[in-house]
Every structure is written in structure tokens, then in C-alpha cells.
């Protein structure tokens, strides 16, 4: 907890709650925060792990929703956040980066808007924790949800929720805590209030070791290498006739590239990359329906390449060659 609190500048380590993944953390935060009649502002960049809890609360608690639209490059207009605020607005929920285009959101700017209007700011850092700087105090983040198995390099089955002091959530599950056994209610103090049941101790130990590794190597060093690999791939494939690349590559971003080859089905392209070249990609809709609609790729989907610290330039060149051959 102390390592994660330091990593994200969460002022209190006991306000770091362990979860199984980002999806659990997001459900915990969204369902524990919102009341009937609340209004929430989110964006077209959101993953289904944000969208589906919101849609469920829209149906079950009459929570109303507004979305900041994305353009054909996956960009958003920050002024739209303020234009969408109503008297009953409770929170702004925003991903730190699109899992499809890789485009990053200026969460410090959004946090300032939220706090200027007395709103709670929830950030989905699934795509960025471990690769882009996150400072809960400086960026005015009230609730931060993250996963351990992506850029934090930890095991699957790890994640968490960091809460600013003063934020209270209804527990979305209750049960054994190992303390206050004779209390019929869930204990009030964090993290116990939100950690019913046995935690993934082995996974948490692995995540702790991963944080040590990131600190030793340096997050900026990791980010620079991943960005260099991503740029090498982007420059190679964007020059290939018949290839369409999605997203804004002039702005801050993560090391993913989503593309299509002509009108080929994205699943078939991904299968060919795996079977013929040994390249693992993610095709389809990426749990990001609003983003695909914004990009006009709802029918075809897209093929997403993700680049990490352990990839090499030779692997990037192989991937470029594979895309070129499939496009011919």
C-alpha cells in the first residue's frame, strides 16, 4: 500500500484498496458513489468497465449521463465538460487514455474543472498506470482506479482503488474482514470497509516486486523506449498503401497503434498476424463501443498493436513487414 500511495501520490496508504482488477475497482467506485438522481459526465473514450456500470445505474437508480464526444481522431473538446455541467451533476468520470487510439487525456485539466464546480473526479488509469505520470494531489483526482497487470507489470488478478480523504463509498460487497468480528455491519475504516474477503496475497506480492522494478529502471526510461517503438511502427505502417491508422499522433499518448488494412475484417487480419508471423494483436471492438462509433469503425473494428518495455526494434520491423505483406 505504501509503495502504491507513493507511486500515485495518494496522501494516505490506508486509502489504497486492493481489488482483482480495474473492472472491480471501477464498479466499487461508481456503484458506491452515485445516488438516485445524480448526473455524471463521462467521455466517448470510456471502456465498458466504466460504461456498463453507468448504464446499469441509469436503469436502476435513474442516474443521468452525458458524454463528451470524440472526433474522428479520438480527440475531445475540454470546454465540453463545463458545458455539460448541471445543478445535479455529481461527478466527472474519465479515462486517462483511450485503450483503442492511445490518445491521452489531460486529467489535470479535467480535475481542475471538476473541483472548480465542486464535483468528484474519478480517473480510470487502466491504460496509463506505470507509464504516464499520475499525481492524485496535483491532478486533483478523488478516485483513481488501476490494474496491476498492464504497465505496472504485475500479475493478473491485481488492481486497486485509491481514494482521496473525505470520499466515502458504500461497500459493494460485505463479509469477512478479520477485524470487528462481532460487528454486524461492515467496519467503517479504510481499507477494511472495501476489502471484504481474502485478498490475492501472492498477486499483491508480485505487484510489489513489479513496483520495485519500475522504480529501479525508471518510469520515464520505460515510457521513452515504448514511445520510440510505437513511433517506429507508426512511421512504418502509415506509409503503406491501404493501411488506415487511427488516433492523433501529435499529442501525448500511450504506446498502442490501432489500424485497419483496406476493408479486411480485423479478426481475420489478427488471425493472420498470429498464425503466419507469430504476432499477437487485439482485433474487434476493444470493449470501447462509443470510441469505435466516433472513429467510424463500428462494423470493421480495428487491429490494435501494443508495445512494451520488453519488445525490440527487430520485432517492430517484423510487424511492419507483416502489415505490408498483408496489405499487398
Model-assigned labels for residue ranges:
Residues 1-328:
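Pyridoxal 5′-phosphate
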Amino acid at each position: 500500500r505504501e509503495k502504491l500511495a507513493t507511486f500515485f501520490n495518494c496522501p494516505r496508504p490506508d486509502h489504497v484498496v486492493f481489488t482483482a482488477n480495474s473492472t472491480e475497482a471501477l464498479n466499487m467506485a461508481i456503484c458506491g458513489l452515485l445516488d438516485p438522481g445524480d448526473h455524471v459526465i463521462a467521455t466517448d473514450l470510456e471502456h465498458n468497465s466504466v460504461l456498463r456500470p453507468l448504464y446499469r445505474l441509469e436503469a436502476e437508480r435513474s442516474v443521468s449521463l452525458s458524454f463528451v464526444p470524440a472526433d474522428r481522431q479520438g480527440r475531445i473538446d475540454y470546454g465540453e465538460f463545463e458545458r455539460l455541467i448541471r445543478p445535479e451533476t455529481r461527478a466527472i468520470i474519465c479515462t486517462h487514455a483511450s485503450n483503442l487510439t492511445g490518445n491521452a487525456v489531460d486529467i489535470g485539466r479535467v480535475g481542475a474543472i471538476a473541483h472548480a464546480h465542486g464535483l468528484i473526479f474519478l480517473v480510470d488509469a487502466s491504460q496509463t498506470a506505470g507509464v504516464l505520470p499520475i499525481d492524485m494531489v496535483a491532478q486533483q483526482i478523488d478516485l483513481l482506479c488501476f490494474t496491476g497487470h498492464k504497465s505496472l507489470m504485475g500479475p493478473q488478478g491485481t488492481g486497486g482503488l485509491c481514494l482521496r480523504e473525505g470520499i466515502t463509498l458504500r461497500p459493494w460487497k460485505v463479509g469477512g474482514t478479520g477485524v470487528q468480528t462481532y460487528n454486524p455491519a461492515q467496519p467503517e475504516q479504510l481499507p477494511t470497509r472495501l476489502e471484504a474477503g481474502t485478498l490475492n496475497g501472492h498477486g499483491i506480492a508480485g505487484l510489489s516486486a513489479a513496483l520495485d522494478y519500475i522504480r529501479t529502471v525508471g518510469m520515464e526510461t520505460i515510457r521513452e523506449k515504448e514511445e520510440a517503438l510505437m513511433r517506429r511502427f507508426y512511421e512504418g505502417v502509415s506509409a503503406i498503401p491501404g493501411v488506415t491508422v487511427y488516433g492523433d499522433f501529435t499529442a501525448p499518448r500511450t504506446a498502442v497503434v490501432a489500424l485497419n488494412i483496406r476493408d479486411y475484417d480485423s479478426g481475420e487480419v489478427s488471425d493472420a498476424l498470429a498464425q503466419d508471423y507469430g504476432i499477437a494483436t487485439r482485433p474487434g471492438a476493444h470493449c470501447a463501443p462509443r470510441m469505435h462509433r466516433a472513429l467510424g469503425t463500428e462494423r470493421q473494428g480495428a487491429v490494435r498493436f501494443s508495445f512494451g518495455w520488453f519488445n525490440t526494434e527487430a520485432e517492430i520491423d517484423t510487424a511492419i513487414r507483416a502489415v505490408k505483406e498483408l496489405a499487398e
